[in-house]
Amino acid sequence: PNMTMRSVYMDYYNQLNQIEGNAQRYVPVYRKYDADRRLEPLVQNYFEQYLGQFLAQVFDKINENFIRCSFYELVSRYLSSCYTFAIEQNNSAGRSDFEMAGIPGTDYYTDDRVVEFKYYRGKDAERMLSLSEPLPEHVEQVKGYAEDTKRKFPNYNVLLL
């Protein structure tokens, strides 16, 4: 489905499950992003403020696609005037989960962010949370996406997460 349908679905899902999406949960972090351009706090805010509303049992039912769509819906709500967004972006190295590229004519132009989500079931959580850094194969995967973007858009500053 296209991005509009994904947003409609996520909005419906949030209402159906009484997931609170008010601005107080998110706006302060997005304002800070405007000043420092650090994506990690946006991801942390998403996990704590959005996913943190779900009961633990839900996490065995949701998948990586849900994570991508709900993250897209939240980020695009606050940054759509600065970035264009792509979910499952095709490139020569594969399909990146989430990409956001600065819109020409804005201060964000040439800013490109690549995010690769890795979803693990509860039984693998302890092992994954004990890692101090990403697995090398995951790093190489994202670097491949970044290199592809740099080839297509050499003037872009590609940041990975």
Where are these regions (language model features)?
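Nucleic-acid nuclease catalytic cores
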Residues: 131-161
